[in-house]
Amino acid sequence: MKPINIQDQFLNQIRKENTYVTVFLLNGFQLRGQVKGFDNFTVLLESEGKQQLIYKHAISTFAPQKNVQLELE
């Protein structure tokens, strides 16, 4: 049985559904936008037509505007 990767499932779901999300960084700064892509180290966030590439090690929390349905089986 393959281990569940909740992080990838969560990010992929908010990406596919174009869910608006608030990203809290470790320094307390907040970014708002939509996740357009991600890999093992970064998240691409788009807000008001501008893109920001954020390193995951700088992120504390993702807070989506609506609940995300994950398949944990």
UniProtKB/Swiss-Prot annotation:
The keyword Transferase does not apply. GO terms for cellular component: cytosol. Keywords: RNA-binding, Stress response. Homohexamer. Belongs to the Hfq family. HAMAP family: Hfq. PANTHER family: RNA-BINDING PROTEIN HFQ. This is RNA-binding protein Hfq.
